[in-house]
Amino acid sequence: MKILVIGGTGLTGRLVSKKLEKLGHQVIIGSPSHGVDIMTGEGLSQALENTEIVIDLSNSSSPEEENAINFFLTAGKNLVNAELAANIRHHLVLSIVGTDDALEIGYLRAKKHQEDNIKNSGIPYTIIRSTQFHEHTDTIIAVQGLADKVFVSKIDYQPIALEDVTDYIVQFTLEEPKNGTVEIAGPTRANMDDFVAKYIEISGKPLKVFSDEDSKYMHLVVPKSLLVPAGEYNAGKIHFEDWALSTLAN
């Protein structure tokens, strides 16, 4: 089966592409460096020739609201027009758990535009909403750290390993379109500061975690349960501590 992976040069895209190729599928990488630009439409029609499935793992160059909304609206329009012309039978998009619940956050509002674009397109689709990745922990520490202190929110957190994310993307790709939304999350739920503290403990870094109910996440005030599933979800297999031990040992 021929599958176009938009954002195929990114970390998630590379892993998804490798797994699909290992299963015997023909994967086309959709990125400007491979001659496919979803912002201009360049190379899209050629990439979609005899293609059955599109996986959209694209992201804006900046999380800033205006930039992100412009990206997802423009790219989404180009993708839908090209996919309708090519009779694509399944479009998948990777999104974020909680997108509906905090539209005052500009980036989530942009992701909602991306979701709605494919929902209203007439193309069979599956939206995969994921919690934050285990691999995001270093970014949290970098953004919220100051000298030897890391200020971390006590909001609910249920991160998932990138390995599990890509396994689910491949699984849903090879299933029939849901024409709806599925959610994926890690196997363990706790407060965000618990995960960060455990990671720092395993790493041996001389950092101290400070947290309270008012602490911000990535400089944003977010609802306590925004980043975790509110209903049914597909659980990952890799526990955070096991991932951290493996990652930090390398």
Model-predicted segments: where are they?
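Non-catalytic, hydrophobic alpha-helical segments
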Residues: 54, 165-169, 184, 192-195, ...
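NAD(P)H-binding glycine-rich loop region in Rossmannoid oxidoreductase-like domains
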Residues: 21-86, 97-103
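Conserved beta-loop-beta element that borders a ligand/cofactor-binding pocket
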Residues: 90, 95, 116-136
